[in-house]
Amino acid sequence: MSTPTQLSYKDAGVDIDAGNALVDNIKTAVKRTHRPEVMGNLGGFGALCELPTKYKHPVLVSGTDGVGTKLRLAIDYKKHDTVGIDLVAMCSNDLIVSGAEPLFFLDYYATGKLDVDAATAVVKGIAEGCVQSGCALIGGETAEMPGMYEGDDYDLAGFCVGVVEKEEIIDGTKVVAGDSLIALGASGPHSNGFSLIRKVLEVSGANPEQELEGKALIDHLLEPTKIYVKSLLKLLEQTEVHAMAHITGGGFWENIPRVLPDDCKAVIQGDSWQWPSIFNWLMENGNIAEFEMYRTFNCGVGMVVALPSDKVEAALTLLNAEGEKAWLIGEIAKRDDSEEQVEIL
């Protein structure tokens, strides 16, 4: 009778040493995200974080999101260094809509076989996103699950917790007819609409490496999502804001109504900005209707802010000084029950 072969976890497809190598690779990047409220070091069973002492009546705000099928393009073209920024942006931009300051972030990275270099690039991107949004990367999970993912595929999920003063929560209840709407420019498609983007690439037969205005098409598409947190926190310190809408999946039609009272509508001046070239390319090469563009993509607008009309000039000055591309995009008007909550003129 032959001696049974001794099996190891690695024989089953899980490489503990690779996981340890990943942790070593990311330690310096993670330390860059540190906040004074964080207690303990990376690697504990639970991550600890105190509430900042400046808050009198702190309310925690949480959010979770992913990067969607933008990951498919990143994996196919081996561009792993920016999808981590996307992950943090999708979560932290949602938190700032309530007026919340992001405190900490956790990530979940799942794959069939751990590619240490790719995972390192992803987590370093997550750390960069945390630096940009001012939150600490305090923990995460790397799951190597053979048989669950094909080849080099991986998936990401992010979890962010922030804090806001109870009396300063922004929930849209103060929005009134006559308020003005300010737009903050997007860096590209951000992290939404990529199933349609990939379909456009398929039916058009376009080469993702071809140039569009001096830049590879794939680089336009994988440009990381803009993080608006620090600029908007400064705006909130100095200006009265009634509502904010993060323009993500569902575009203008789905996201702006989420922060409006039922008796109000947003009237958007469609000629107040020019779409970035990538959106014109998608519309033309995919034969996509304008309505569908606005329902799927941000079309160059990553965030919309509602505020009193007499605060517009100061707000635009501040936001543009902070490096944002901000402009007046429309206003709030009274709405009848039969009307849509978003009009684009």
Curated annotation (Swiss-Prot):
It comes from the Bacteria. The keyword Transmembrane does not apply. It is found in: Cytoplasm. It catalyses: 2-formamido-N(1)-(5-O-phospho-beta-D-ribosyl)acetamidine + ATP = 5-amino-1-(5-phospho-beta-D-ribosyl)imidazole + ADP + phosphate + H(+). Pathway: Purine metabolism; IMP biosynthesis via de novo pathway; 5-amino-1-(5-phospho-D-ribosyl)imidazole from N(2)-formyl-N(1)-(5-phospho-D-ribosyl)glycinamide: step 2/2. This is Phosphoribosylformylglycinamidine cyclo-ligase. Belongs to the AIR synthase family. Its EC number is 6.3.3.1. SUPFAM superfamilies: PurM C-terminal domain-like, PurM N-terminal domain-like. GO terms for molecular function: ATP binding; phosphoribosylamine-glycine ligase activity; phosphoribosylformylglycinamidine cyclo-ligase activity. It is an enzyme of class 6 (ligase). GO terms for biological process: 'de novo' IMP biosynthetic process; adenine biosynthetic process. It comes from Shewanella woodyi (strain ATCC 51908 / MS32).
